[in-house]
Amino acid sequence: MLRSTTFTRSFHSSRAWLKGQNLTEKIVQSYAVNLPEGKVVHSGDYVSIKPAHCMSHDNSWPVALKFMGLGATKIKNPSQIVTTLDHDIQNKSEKNLTKYKNIENFAKKHHIDHYPAGRGIGHQIMIEEGYAFPLNMTVASDSHSNTYGGLGSLGTPIVRTDAAAIWATGQTWWQIPPVAQVELKGQLPQGVSGKDIIVALCGLFNNDQVLNHAIEFTGDSLNALPIDHRLTIANMTTEWGALSGLFPVDKTLIDWYKNRLQKLGTNNHPRINPKTIRALEEKAKIPKADKDAHYAKKLIIDLATLTHYVSGPNSVKVSNTVQDLSQQDIKINKAYLVSCTNSRLSDLQSAADVVCPTGDLNKVNKVAPGVEFYVAAASSEIEADARKSGAWEKLLKAGCIPLPSGCGPCIGLGAGLLEPGEVGISATNRNFKGRMGSKDALAYLASPAVVAASAVLGKISSPAEVLSTSEIPFSGVKTEIIENPVVEEEVNAQTEAPKQSVEILEGFPREFSGELVLCDADNINTDGIYPGKYTYQDDVPKEKMAQVCMENYDAEFRTKVHPGDIVVSGFNFGTGSSREQAATALLAKGINLVVSGSFGNIFSRNSINNALLTLEIPALIKKLREKYQGAPKELTRRTGWFLKWDVADAKVVVTEGSLDGPVILEQKVGELGKNLQEIIVKGGLEGWVKSQL
């Protein structure tokens, strides 16, 4: 089992008094548009952003259809947009090839940079071609946009409506998340990789500590952490629950770009050239974060206490040392070295060193009988480099099955998927049930070296078992959590802080108010909000949507909740699928504002995109749960508490009995600027885009 020693302590701070910014806030400040003069952005603020680049992949055609459906005919800034083909490249059906051709023709017509099937995974292309560049903000309509954080680029995912908005107007919106600091200290043992770090983090801190947070990595270990390791860690901050995973700009990163420039063999690359690297060196001299920057929490892990870790089966929240699993004699049927997580050159070489440790192709450790080991480079460039280095030949000599540079089995597409009853071990990022094939299969995640060792021995194994070397000494991982709550005394102090009112757009209410109706549960998913059986019925009238809203959660919701009420729920409200009706059904019910401890990211984006307002107030959830502790359980409960949100003052007040009753809670919240108000006034992001054309 996973063993660790964790200490928890806390200190207090108040957002209202903080002037400084962390690195995430600094980058957002640079890419925010139409801010009021002198406005300094912080976590919680809603801002309009104009990202440096926006990438979409096989979903580019649905984005294009939405773009054209809005009435748009011209890409606002063609150099901002990148399209790639990577997910379903093994599919040679006429339907898929037609879609690919449509994307290619659209890109050509609008002078968009386009990378065809076979060039590589979109995220790797963004890295190799310099679109994701240190200290810029880069988005993509894909959940693993966090990967760019390994290069010091603030990468975060968007939904298709956002992508269409960026195509048409150059911008969309973002609410700056709470920022968690993750300190990596100590020296990583020889052979332990970035994959081991992130798999351990997902398993050790598995109680949603970083859910919907931005992460900033710090620590004395960073200079010794190669860029490929950083990219792997940043990539899987998505599975950890975060919205970004940002590494700082340091000498290791700048040297990586200098080497990249040398490899390109030209000084005329549009994004990676002597001028951009010199500018980066100058920017790197500026402090990474202000001394008085605020962080929601700090997590610390001592890398010196790590060993090889494996997650699963079928969950990244379950992690064990490879030594523990090896003793369980877990037989495998398939192994995978593919995806944007771990298919870079160093990953392929790591696996090659396990199957051919001497370098002699006549002394290769063969893949075990009955095991299929699939391998694909993250890009065509990486495959060419692996062929040149000899790593590719070693893997094929061992019996690996090559696949084209693309997503393939990681996304459950193409050859080599898990069959019912099979067990697979993979260097990818997700092992959710059914993700890589059958729902009746078991999937584990591990580093390339562990995957290769397991393929050779036919069971989950450590590299040391293949190489006949000593196992890494292990006695438990040392971790620490420093929480950073806003306490009630500071909440009260916030009201005395110097005020800078938010300007209110004509037609937008200065305040929202209503009685709080409590749906006391965490992780209410989109199916609970709007039943899946209605999702693909396009003709459901508004009245029907209102009737069925929340029926899978509580059939009594329909009669207990009235138009104008404010629904309040627990944490991670709206998790699950991307159905927009989860937001529009609440609007149909007459609910204009939902409050929770936290929201699922896609639900949060779909809400604003459809003009449903949301507020995260964890302190309110705590107070309500204290109020009803020991009371008979009610799924939907009218509380008799009232909330008023003063948008101009960015403050909420909760009272008892009426809006004029005794104050229960008073707290500052993120600012909703004029740009976001305009989206709401226009009925959502699509309406706003149409108004800009």
Curated annotation (Swiss-Prot):
GO cellular component: mitochondrion
Annotated binding of [4Fe-4S] cluster, by residue: 340, 407, 410
Subcellular location: Mitochondrion
InterPro entries, sorted: Acnase/IPM_dHydase_lsu_aba_1/3, Acoase/IPM_deHydtase_lsu_aba, Aconitase/3IPM_dehydase_swvl, Aconitase_4Fe-4S_BS, Aconitase_4Fe-4S_dom, AconitaseA/IPMdHydase_ssu_swvl, Homoaconitase_mito, Homoaconitase_swivel
Cofactor list: [4Fe-4S] cluster
Keywords: Amino-acid biosynthesis, Iron, Iron-sulfur, Lyase, Lysine biosynthesis, Metal-binding, Mitochondrion, Transit peptide
Entry EC no(s): 4.2.1.36
Keyword Oxidoreductase appears in the UniProt entry: no
UniProt main location, coarse: mitochondrion
Cofactor detail note: Binds 1 [4Fe-4S] cluster per subunit.
Reaction equation(s) it catalyzes: (2R,3S)-homoisocitrate = cis-homoaconitate + H2O
Coiled-coil blocks: none
Pathway note: Amino-acid biosynthesis; L-lysine biosynthesis via AAA pathway; L-alpha-aminoadipate from 2-oxoglutarate: step 3/5
GO terms of molecular function: 4 iron, 4 sulfur cluster binding; homoaconitate hydratase activity; metal ion binding
Domain of life assignment: Eukaryota
GO biological processes: lysine biosynthetic process via aminoadipic acid
Transit peptide interval: 1-20
Top enzyme class: lyase
Misc note: Present with 7350 molecules/cell in log phase SD medium.
Cited PANTHER family: HOMOACONITASE, MITOCHONDRIAL, HOMOACONITASE, MITOCHONDRIAL-RELATED
Function: Catalyzes the reversible hydration of cis-homoaconitate to (2R,3S)-homoisocitrate, a step in the alpha-aminoadipate pathway for lysine biosynthesis.
Family: Belongs to the aconitase/IPM isomerase family.
Listed name of the protein: Homoaconitase, mitochondrial
Organism this protein belongs to: Saccharomyces cerevisiae (strain ATCC 204508 / S288c)
Gene name of the encoded protein: LYS4
